Amino acid sequence: MKAVIFDMDGVIVDTEPYNMRRVYEYVHFQQPNAKLEDMYQNAGRVKKDVWIRIASVIGQNRGWEETRSDYETNWKPSHPFEIPYKEIFRKDTITILKWARENGMKTAVASSTAYEKVKEILTEVQVVPYLDVITSGEFFERSKPDPAIYLKTAEVLGVSPGDCVAIEDSTAGITAASRAGMKVIALKDDRFGFDRSLADDEIDSLGDFIEHYQRLINK
């Protein structure tokens, strides 16, 4: 293997519960019958796909752009919500990145989140110096589970997709990396019912990654 590629939300930082809860509060205000579980399929997807689904759950014959605009303009300013990124940062990320560099491997993040937000979060948790490439789903017409973001990340790194291992947690992310032809090690998260069947291996924590990676490539 020549590269390790991380997803960000749910892997490097445990943001999924915060993101889902924040949006769910808005959705539930608009549609009292909505359930938190309705938000689970949003994990790992770009904003457009997320808001298409949210608009569908809310109903009211509003398009996704109008729904998102209402959320950003009217809801968010009156409902402040801070995510403690440093507190939910998985510090074993640094261990893996240092190990990868020491073993001649390139490193990247491939996240569905908007690029500036990805940079902001990764800078706050001090991961950026250990990365060769940061790729955002906002630059792609199709989001995870489409493999485009992973294929492009491998291209920018200058390696074959088959020489990459991806660390993912969500169904969409695991599917995207697998479709790109990469090895996939899934970080287990049973809170959201993610399907990990396409992963090559599973880990309970990032601290288990190096051992499982070595076992995987030595099969």
Predicted regions and their residues:
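Asp-based, Mg2+/Mn2+-dependent phosphohydrolase catalytic module
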Residues: 1-2, 98-101, 114-219
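N-terminal helical cap/lid subdomain that shapes the substrate entry/recognition surface
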Residues: 2-103
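Short glycine/serine/threonine-biased micro-segments
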Residues: 8, 42, 106, 135, ...
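Residues at secondary-structure transition points
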Residues: 14, 38, 42-45, 62, ...
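N-terminal start-of-chain detector that recognizes signal peptides
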Residues: 23-24, 79-80, 106-109, 137-139, ...
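Short linear motifs at secondary-structure transitions and domain/linker junctions
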Residues: 27-28, 54, 81-83, 109-111, ...
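Residue-level detector of anion-binding/catalytic polar loops
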Residues: 33, 106, 183
